């Protein structure tokens, strides 16, 4: 049976050898081919008839082998025998599909052939399903569209049909407001068009871009670019969504994800807004999804498509390929017998509030019944104490007073996991132990990046490495649980145990507590949380009891716990208010002192509770029917997971109100701010290598310990990349995460902008007053002597006066200046690091290498230094680069500059643009003027050029800027530092340094 119509394609300019084919391409389809497209893939009959035809005999050769390259044809134009033999299978027939060339608007010669009896791949012997013309550039499938489908697409996207006889794809190009879906293959493109979407098909997942090669045949990835057809479409902020197959093979998933990331990045660079469509149904391709579940399923998934950056984050945290057991339980209640006896590493991913810790408690009890000791490692002292209580073991601080003395096990913070800590930890004492890493993502992230671990990080990582190996080799087990468990922690543990026969077992609990009862989410936009503050105050005035989470505690931040407390105490004197932050929980006499252990007993006593990230993780607030709402204000300091963790501390199902900035400030980004682990690792290695060269060869020596601990550096880079991606699309990422956890976004009622501004201004006035009072108090308090100062630094519990004393002592010793309110503010703004750069660039240059060597020696353990730590602390690479950029020219008062006089400076900076980015954290582009570049770099030293005016002849007037000497007492600071460094280095036998000291 033949299905045909009277359509005949128009003539098409192209290769002469294919012209006759182009003129005679009538559309006729065999019944089997028609059913494959229409019934099997859900393509409209009209689209199938316009784009597909059945071929057999010699005709397919003319469609496929039209290239005029000598490799294909002899001098007389005839196809070479090798090609005829290779493609002999086409004579058995098949279907051909081709559409429109959007570059010309005419029919495309290029297309795809699917043989009824396909040839096999010479390597893997699998049938090659789809054939594309060889020795010609690949294109995309932009299928011809009938008027009915066109009308359907126009209606869906609310774009008017053209009155003139304009082609469909010309219409699409002319309307960038029309979104486009990219899929793989012609049939899927046809199915999407039929469903009412502008869709194009790639012949393969990697065919959206091209990678040039150098003379040696090596790919030049930095020169990758979109194919011309995609470049045409990716303009003017057009929305483009990927809709590739949802495969289950790990290797294929990795390939598809890589293709989306690369193509998506190029599309965004070209001006498109990129997203990704995913689904959980068994349907592999989008045509399967439509045929099996209907177009509504596609509409639903399109509605819930994820921005590229958010999808990349989800992709980095997806563990589905590692899962051994999937359950759907409100509270984890897995029979221990369901876990294989030989499984020594158990990973658990289960949502917040699903009883992970309670289930671990049962496991711990079974281990103790078998006479195995249990070691619980956490990232926070309070959490360690809480877990010790819940798991019925000792906290490390209780060993001396406990009747069991740690015989059953203990809980401790990972900061103490090394022999030189107060715990004097010895991994050899944990023979056959069961180790629990509750909230493993937080624990490992803390071990790898927390400033509290910096001094001993090399020892901590070595001990952790040895502990895991020793415990498991002696029959122990490792339990790793987290609501946000990612492949990063999973693979780090695997790397530690590389070469060992330890079997992992991964449990995934798919239950989402927010779905049990609908949890409402009110999500606020805007550049600041004034609208949220307005509704919060309204809720308080209406009698609601509110739990408020904010990212800051200090008075220097407008929306901090301290400033909100002051405002609310003034406005609502009848309300019972509790502030919980790092200072209040450690301040004797404060109502929040030591409250973390008993929140469920304390919080019901209050109407308004204000929390900082001190209550971000490790706390479960289980009280019911007390709080009416939860309010969250982020500033971009917390990670995406960290912010969402805070919102979930209260288990009760009450509405959540959330405001966060669109993007996190660049100052919060980790390492070089990169979005890929490879980029971060590359720059970490470069920085460390440069430091080694600049401070002396002895620092480059390392033991075999570095090889053993390489997996930790790679994990650090992966965690950093994940966090940076979240920071780069902060608002989108947090909203997506909350919605994926089951929250339901609700519409906000209209807010009076004038009232919101008044409320914001009131809080800002409170902040200005509080911040000034605090700075004055710090400046007026007595400067502690050295003994008192050291005691204050070690002291955990401190009164407000003691905190001010410690800060005063630090400022006095750091700057050598009289402590004033102005100095406190400058220090808060990062003045110390700015002056430090200028000091070692100028008068202190002779001491820079010695300083960095001392830092290296402090951090090293058996010749090993964790590179991110030494990179954060070493200044030599920064100083070296600033010298290469000739920054000294701007430090001479009275010297003037114009854009023209700094052209050479700009060229030099552009030459070093990449090192400027990963060493100084500044982005330099060709679009910046020379003076803009100079000001950006001088900002690193808290300096700037002063504008003097426009001078010169009428035809050549130029803006003139002058270098000025800052009037901020920095010379006194430098003199203080010079005296300090001379005293430290006076006894060092180094001719260069000794000569400098004598000259100084």
Curated annotation (Swiss-Prot):
Residues 787-809 have a biased composition (Basic and acidic residues). Pfam families: DUF3854. InterPro entries: DUF3854, P-loop_NTPase, Slr7037-like, TOPRIM_DnaG/twinkle. Residues 787-812 are annotated as: Disordered. Keywords: Plasmid. PANTHER family: SLR0554 PROTEIN (PTHR34985:SF1). This is Uncharacterized protein SYNPCC7002_B0001.
